[in-house]
Amino acid sequence: MSRCIRQSVCTNFNVCRRQCFSTYASALKEMTHPIKPSAQTLRHLQFTQRIPFQKGLEIQETLVRANLDIKDIQSKIERKLIQLDEEYKGTATINDNEKRILDKVMAMKPNPIILTFEFEPTYTGGKRIKKTMTPDQIAAYESFIPETQKDNPRPKFVQVERGGQVTFHGPGQIVIYIILDLKTFQSFPAKCLVSCIEQATIRTLKNTKMCDDTDKPLNLDAMTTKDTGVWVENGKKKVASVGIHVRRSITSHGVAINVNTDLSYMNSFEMCGLKNTLTTSIMEQRPDAVVNVQSVAISFVKEMTKLLGIKTLERMQIDDVNILKKNP
């Protein structure tokens, strides 16, 4: 079942981060803006039931593949038109019907999409450790079950194509995947997308309501450091991990925010390659708050929409993960 809700609403990392942050500081509303009509509406697919990590990865890859397939078709058309122009020395013509079809194909560009999930316990390995992870290390992750998590499935280890090293996804954590074409936004390289994700997370931790019955915000004082991610307690504890992947300007992966996660899943191991670093959660920082992964998901997507300069947000709440299965 699903429900649809419509709302209005650099090559050098350090240089890019400063430039993007400066934009954010001087104009709180946005860090970029759409330059293509397709990017003017953002679609939020909000999965409301906990699912296996691989299922979420499969959904993400299906949507990314659709974006890439459209790019492939458009590139082939462009190459063919150039070839015809060269062969006929600028005299080649196409009839009106062919032109209408080609114009429609060339105008096809998917909207930006944000997927939000809560996953079963999973450790994921980024590209940095793809060739160095040993069977013994994987076994250690997959055999770890906190005393309070006996009713949850045993953790799995999954290799993924995002940047970074090992991180954890599981109950009490909202995982947010951002699928968009960087070229449909003004001056928006991948490193600036990372900065945008971090700032959206910081604003989420500050502005999300303590509970449904009050307008009082969490007002968590979060920040960025020299290490990617979002931190609290003056940079001593990490509350959100960030990692993206880009193929032909199409992005995937994004951010994981710890809401009421069992922190022993992360603090019993070295996460993200950061030694002597502790992970925290919203509930550890604000034990009197009544928030859940879904309220944080909605809050983050609103903040990200503003920072992207997008005016229209459409949300589809999905409680049946099989709704996106391909027809046989």
From Swiss-Prot:
Domain BPL/LPL catalytic, first and last residues per copy: 108-312
EC number assigned by the record: 2.3.1.181
Organism: Saccharomyces cerevisiae (strain ATCC 204508 / S288c) (Baker's yeast)
Record's miscellaneous remark: Present with 1200 molecules/cell in log phase SD medium. In the reaction, the free carboxyl group of octanoic acid is attached via an amide linkage to the epsilon-amino group of a specific lysine residue of lipoyl domains of lipoate-dependent enzymes.
Pathway(s) where this gene product acts: Protein modification; protein lipoylation via endogenous pathway; protein N(6)-(lipoyl)lysine from octanoyl-[acyl-carrier-protein]: step 1/2
Assigned GO CC terms: mitochondrion
Binding site for substrate: 162-169, 241-243, 254-256
Site (Lowers pKa of active site Cys): 238
Gene: LIP2
Name of protein: Octanoyltransferase, mitochondrial
